[in-house]
Amino acid sequence: QQELDGVMLDDIDGALWAEEIIEAARVGEIPRMKRPIVAVGVDPSVSEKPGDETGIIVAVVDGAIRDMYKRHAYVLADDSLQAPPEIWAKVLAATAQRFGGAPIIAETNQGGGLIKAVLTGIDPSLKVLGVHSRFGKAIRAEPVVLAAQQGRVHHVGYWPLLEDQLTTWVPDETRKSPDRLDAYVHVLTALLVKAPEGLYGGTVRA
């Protein structure tokens, strides 16, 4: 259930994620991994609309599990923020550096070139891996939603703003752009569904 002004509400009709699914898989820490692969998903704010955020989500899987559909992903951080490119780029770089130079997963047709451009002047060693999709947000999210329903997506601790967006965004109805959700889908798709070329991962402890 969602809480709004102290009143508990049922799950939102049409929302892709249910709160009980997230809660059932929540953990306090990640398990020991043989070959952790960490990546940072980003959905950059490229518009001047007030309230638009840049989604920055970090997750890890055990790369020793070769079958991606058997992997479990652990969401480690939500560093999303509302800021102009010169600010969110610094936060994005700091997030990637904090996790051992973790690769950044970005959609090529939604600010991918901008991300590479702004990061070059901050830390040119950071790798930006582009992903491209011809489908809408809801279709892209489906494999990640399925993984969550299978109990394979674990939030390490609580990420209230991210979780609120996941459980309230309704395709074709919610007007606000789901920036955190998009970044979440980018990184979890790369780790659980289809890895972009060049994905090697960062480190959990940096």
Region annotations inferred by a language model:
Residues 163-189:
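Charged alpha-helix within mobile-element recombinases
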Residues 187-206:
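Acidic two-metal-ion nuclease catalytic site recognized across multiple nuclease folds
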